[in-house]
Amino acid sequence: MMHHLIQEITKEQLRTDLPDFRPGDTVRVHVKVIEGNRERIQVFEGVVIKRRGAGISETFTVRKVSYGVGVERTFPVHTPKIAKLEVVRRGKVRRAKLYYLRQLRGKAARIKEIVR
């Protein structure tokens, strides 16, 4: 009984407006950031290196290199803090978790693009 109640509550929270994306795709995440009493949109663009979980607790991690420093940020998929998510490029990869990209530098860290 309690399980069905939890499912009903989480079903209302799930987002359906996000595009389909996978590890290897380059995405642009528009995040709502609250600074003091004002809210603004911050854009974080990078490669999706992993997706994990299912349902309301599903998350994804985006990696980018900013001023020579690798930055990874993990977002819940169904959070209201994501204003918009756009897929910039579709990548062709053969792994679900792209942790090996952390060791690669420069052109070696590129991912082949595919047309899906």
UniProtKB/Swiss-Prot annotation:
GO terms for biological process: translation. HAMAP family: Ribosomal_bL19. This is Large ribosomal subunit protein bL19. This protein is located at the 30S-50S ribosomal subunit interface and may play a role in the structure and function of the aminoacyl-tRNA binding site. GO terms for cellular component: cytosolic large ribosomal subunit. Keywords: Ribonucleoprotein, Ribosomal protein. Pfam families: Ribosomal_L19. It comes from the Bacteria. One of its GO terms (molecular function) is structural constituent of ribosome. The keyword Ribosomal protein applies. It comes from Geobacillus sp. (strain WCH70).
